[in-house]
Each structure stands twice: as C-alpha cells, then as structure tokens.
Curated annotation (Swiss-Prot):
Belongs to the histone H1/H5 family. Its main location: nucleus. The gene is His1. Residues 1-53, 108-256 are annotated as: Disordered. Residues 45-119 form the H15 domain. This is Histone H1. The modification Phosphoserine is found at residue 11. Residues 1-19, 27-43, 194-229 have a biased composition (Low complexity). Residues 121-140, 176-193 have a biased composition (Basic and acidic residues).
Amino acid sequence: MSDSAVATSASPVAAPPATVEKKVVQKKASGSAGTKAKKASATPSHPPTQQMVDASIKNLKERGGSSLLAIKKYITATYKCDAQKLAPFIKKYLKSAVVNGKLIQTKGKGASGSFKLSASAKKEKDPKAKSKVLSAEKKVQSKKVASKKIGVSSKKTAVGAADKKPKAKKAVATKKTAENKKTEKAKAKDAKKTGIIKSKPAATKAKVTAAKPKAVVAKASKAKPAVSAKPKKTVKKASVSATAKKPKAKTTAAKK
C-alpha cells in the first residue's frame, strides 16, 4: 500500500515540466513573430534620402535652385512619407553633397539655401546615358573579341590550307607521273606499230625506185635512135649539096 501511495504522489510532480516546455515554446513563437513584425515595420517604403533629394531637385527644374521647403513638399507628395521626420537627414545630406560637389548651393548658407545639381551629378543621374555608354562599351568589347576570334580562325584556316596544299600538290604530281607513264607506254606501243607499218612502205618504195630506173633506161634507149637518125639526115643533105655543087665546077672549067 505504501508503494502505491508513493507512485501516485510522484505522478503529479512529474506533470509540471511538460506544461513549462509548452509555455517556453509559445513565448519563443510570440517573440519571433514580434521581431518579424518589427522588422517589417522597420523596412521603409520609400528610397533613401539621397535619392529622394536628388530626384526632387532634378524634377523641380528651378533656375535659381530648389529650396529646402520645396524639396520637402516634393518628397511628401511623391513618396508619401513624413518629410518633417526626415528633415534632419535631408539637411545632413544637403551639406555633405555641397562639400562633395554633387550639389551647388545658389543661395543661403548651410541647409537653409537653394540647391542645384552639378554637371557631374546630372551625368550620373541619367540612366539612359549610362545604359548607352555601357552598351557602346559592350559592343566595342564584343567587336574586339569577334575580331580576335576571326583572326585566330583565319590563321587556323590559313594553316589548314597550307597543310592541304602540299597534299594536293603531291596528289597532282602522282597523277601526272601516272599519266606520263601511261602516255609513254602508249607511245612505245604506237612506235612499235608504226615501225611495223613504216617498214612495209619502205619496202614498197624500194620496189618502186627499183622499177623506175628500168623505165628511165627504156625511155633513154628509145630516145637514142631518134637522135642518131637526125645526123643521118644532115649527112644526106650535105652529100646532096656536094653533088649539086660539083657540076657547077665543071662548067667553069669548060668555059676556060
């Protein structure tokens, strides 16, 4: 009995630690939610004071410069924030910007005068000009890279072409040698054929030349009697004339 009583008395003592742990977890959850809410509230819904002041001066476009009141009014109207709470930050920025050269103070002293943007600040504030400059630089860089790549590729192609040309020359030379060999073989064959063919006409020519002298000799023999016949005629004429002349001599002798 005493043991059961001790067990029952011990059980209620062990229960409180679980409830304590639950409370601690709830507190941590509530604490994390509170910190998240604080962080959400701490993040501003407007850009920093530097950007707001520069934008207000740029968009107001006042010849004599924009005053502190005009800047505050512009900030409250466009960004919908309390410019009175931001006034110390605005004044601090105006003073530092005048010292740095981002702003030019046309009137007054400190943060109570009128302010204009400097030429360097105007150039910095033009996003279009920045983008144009960046795009131009990128184009120049891309052109340089492209020209380098083209130069490398042209060198590679030139080397490849130089490597290919000797091979082509070798192939052409081998083709030419093969063709020359073929032509030489064909010429040799033709020479053999022509030798065989030419020998036959030579033999025929020899026969013709051998036959021609006989004809010439025959012609000469035929012509010789004609030549020999002519002198005979002349001799006869001479004899006739002699015989004719002889009686005349006789007559002259008779006259004596």
